Amino acid sequence: MPIDCKAKCGNRASLKRPKTGDALCKDCFFAAFEAEIHHTITTSKLFRRGEKVAVAASGGKDSTVLAHVLKLLNERHNYGLDLVLLSIDEGITGYRDDSLETVKQNRDDYQMPLKILSYEELYGWTMDRIVAQIGRSNNCTFCGVFRRQALDRGAKLLGVDSIATGHNADDIAETVLMNILRGDTARLRRCTDIRTGGGEDSIPRVKPLKYSYEKEIVMYAHYKKLVYFSTECVFAPNAYRGHARAFLKDLEKVRPSVIMDIIYSGEQLRFKDTVKKPVRGNCERCGFVSSQQPCKACVLLEGLNRGLPKLGIGKKSKGDRMIAKQNQELALRERANLVKNDF
């Protein structure tokens, strides 16, 4: 039996919102979805008039919907923003090369300038080459660290005031769970923040989709007929996040509100004064923001270049021992060569 739209617009309902359970027509769903993002942007004061904002674009559903909605709201509510697309090419054959074609389509559809930066030009490595050297057990560590810094590098190059990322409510709830399971209080402290970074030497990142459900983002993209890339990264099945995602989906079956419950719980967390806070500064090598010296990206890159790919994996003391061992071996070889030359 047909159901009337709960917004009482006179139309028949064509969908049920996963977030609220409301039966709505497509137009009322669009209006509600866009209004919630506008509310998030304005109440959290994510942008200021005249700012230049880079939309982190991957070609996936989240970044495509983010670019579409930001352009729409910018024009509808006169935010006065200068929007550009920033995309990172990790060098994953059969995945990123295809998704970049979608990003270029986004550029044309939304009339936004596009800047693409690659791991190859920034670090001299592609993810395909990195995985060939390290295997698939820690590849997401390398990719995540390099990608975060690559976005910072691209944002600095473009001269933007902030980076808007497509992190949605599901992503944030998953991250809260991951940090709890790992006992990572430093990341748990800031993972629900809608704005991170900022300050004298770093460009802030904002999450306009923080309270938007992944299912609703998919529905919005589907009914709006947006062009996006839906293939999963070929290296993703081995990611730790996948376990948190599966656990969250199981919880959602018995408690539909669990995503927002976890986010709200994360926002209300308070830590004892005795909990050590990471001190953020600038890397002594590359100059980008880091809470360690040298930064994680530089440590991982050094390991790759020295043939010690696991150098930055695990505790710092382990990496120090690996470097010391390699230096000792080099010294012994040099000494052996000197003795050989004397004869």
From Swiss-Prot:
Enzyme Commission (EC) number: 2.7.7.-
Pfam family, one: zn-ribbon_14
SUPFAM superfamilies attached to this UniProt entry: Adenine nucleotide alpha hydrolases-like
GO BP terms in the entry: protein urmylation; tRNA thio-modification; tRNA wobble position uridine thiolation; tRNA wobble uridine modification
The keyword Zinc belongs to this UniProt entry's keyword annotation: no
PROSITE patterns, sorted: UPF0021
InterPro entries per UniProt: CTU1-like_ATP-bd, CTU1_C, Ncs6/Tuc1/Ctu1, Rossmann-like_a/b/a_fold, TilS/TtcA_N, tRNA_thiolation_TtcA_Ctu1, UPF0021_CS
Principal EC category: transferase
GO molecular function: nucleotidyltransferase activity; tRNA binding
Pathway stated in the Swiss-Prot or TrEMBL entry: tRNA modification; 5-methoxycarbonylmethyl-2-thiouridine-tRNA biosynthesis
Protein localization: Cytoplasm
Domain of life: Eukaryota
Keywords: Cytoplasm, RNA-binding, Transferase, tRNA processing, tRNA-binding
Keyword Transferase: yes
Cellular component annotations (GO), alphabetically ordered: cytosol; cytosolic tRNA wobble base thiouridylase complex; mitochondrion
Described function: Plays a central role in 2-thiolation of mcm(5)S(2)U at tRNA wobble positions of tRNA(Lys), tRNA(Glu) and tRNA(Gln). Directly binds tRNAs and probably acts by catalyzing adenylation of tRNAs, an intermediate required for 2-thiolation. It is unclear whether it acts as a sulfurtransferase that transfers sulfur from thiocarboxylated URM1 onto the uridine of tRNAs at wobble position.
Recorded family membership: Belongs to the TtcA family. CTU1/NCS6/ATPBD3 subfamily.
Name this protein carries in UniProt: Cytoplasmic tRNA 2-thiolation protein 1
Species lineage: Eukaryota, Metazoa, Ecdysozoa, Arthropoda, Hexapoda
